[in-house]
Amino acid sequence: MYHIHRLLAPIRSNSVFFSLAQLPKPSLIGCRYKSNNVGSQDSKRTSKNSILHNLGSYSNSAESEILNKLKPITPNDLYVSCTSFDRIGNITAVSRKYPKMQFLKENHLFPRDLRKIDTSSIDVVPVIMIRPSSAILVNLLHIKAIIKKDNVMVFDTSKSEVATKLGIFMYDLELKLKSPANNVCYEFRALESILVSVTSYLEAEIKLHRQQCGIILAELEDEVDRAKLQELLIRSKKLSSFHQRAILIRDVLEELLENDEDLAGMYLTDLKRFEPEEENYEEIESILESYYNQCDEYVQQAGSLLSDIKATEEIVNIILDANRNSLMLFELKITVYTLGFTVATLVPAFYGMNLKNYIEETNWGFGLVLVVSLLQGLAITWLNFRKLHKVQKLTMMGTSNSSKAGTGLSRHIPPTSRVDRWKRGSFLYRLFYGSGGKYSKPSKKFDRPTNREKDAMWRMINDDKAMK
């Protein structure tokens, strides 16, 4: 019954005020209930039963109707467009255009203040500006508003994707202002409604990022795919943008909490003078601290997710580098084998020339050419694999085993079995991996430093630490 009286209240009083929840389906805002429409013969004959029948479906779709009615406007250099709410939450003006100079004079603002909150297609850094005993200027995400002690003006947007969010905010703002005050100032209720809308969208966005990025990271753990990496890059850019916006909003709230003069200026209904000795701003501090902690939580979650993405990217890069090196090594091995076989076929090619060489008359010519060709091919293959194996080694100082032995790194290598030692000493192992191994004799000998050299090195180390 309460909803019926609430719906019929503007009709009975023919008031100029209206509510977002009371709007009919043809329009959300912009039209008042005029007496000629209310007093028509068809509307008078409407029964209470039909109202009750349609009220349930209307209440469920009230918010969806708001989403489809607000439309973006075109920025104008001469006018500002905004929607106004009075002290009890009723809408007094809908998308009303004010001349900028007149608007500045009526609200006691400067032109530089209007640049922060004016409707524009350019995103401005989030800000909450305080005009003591006059107004609070708010620009947070999709909301640009001016809060006074008995009035709230919400600026219209020029972006179609923001119009939906702004419609939901106006609906929530109206309900918040119409609810019981509970000894909370009007300006604080309006500001809290803005902060609730901002933190709600931050929470929804960080949940979406965590869900989408979490799925991609889990898939990359199983398989490194090009499409997944590209999608992760796109998500990472969006997450970085969200992280930056959340940091800016958190910094705005932190600056307000640290400035007692601004806290005192936010009391518009009950004016307070700034007195450094008396810091009694518990009401506004509790509101700002609550939403500051929420913003800080979203910043930490976004930063943690960015760290996970960065760690995953580094691991993927290491895997890709290892695969790339393996492919290059495989290609080099094929090249070495090809070179060995090519050199092995060189002598038979000479032997097969249609010229007299007096070898074909002997019984051992074929065997000699075959043995020489094989030895030549194996020798070339062995030399190339030996050089390739030296290139593969990564040591602290140089590529030789002697430097590794000199640094003492080989002491930490676990001992191998006799079978492994025999394999490393075999002809095939030396052929394909070179003669340089753990158990081979060092090709160079390094003398131990003398005591004088040790003292000089110690002084150099200490001097370097002092300089750092």
From Swiss-Prot:
It is found in: Mitochondrion inner membrane. SUPFAM superfamilies: Magnesium transport protein CorA, transmembrane region. Keywords: Ion transport, Magnesium, Membrane, Mitochondrion, Mitochondrion inner membrane, Transit peptide, Transmembrane, Transmembrane helix, Transport. GO terms for biological process: mitochondrial magnesium ion transmembrane transport. GO terms for molecular function: cardiolipin binding; magnesium ion transmembrane transporter activity. A motif (YGMN) lies at residues 351-354. The chain crosses the membrane at residues 327-347, 365-385. The keyword rRNA-binding does not apply. CDD domains: Mrs2_Mfm1p-like (cd12823). Residues 1-33 form a transit peptide. It is a multi-pass membrane protein. InterPro entries: CorA_TM1_TM2, MRS2-like. It holds the Pfam family MRS2-like. GO terms for cellular component: mitochondrial inner membrane. The keyword Transmembrane helix applies. High-conductance magnesium-selective channel that mediates the influx of magnesium into the mitochondrial matrix. Essential for the splicing of mRNA group II introns in mitochondria by affecting mitochondrial magnesium concentrations, which are critical for group II intron splicing. It also suppresses a variety of mitochondrial intron mutations and its absence may disturb the assembly of mitochondrial membrane complexes. Homopentamer. Forms homooligomers. Interacts with MFM1. Belongs to the CorA metal ion transporter (MIT) (TC 1.A.35) family. This is Mitochondrial inner membrane magnesium transporter MRS2. It comes from Candida albicans (strain SC5314 / ATCC MYA-2876). The lineage of its organism: Eukaryota, Fungi, Dikarya, Ascomycota, Saccharomycotina.
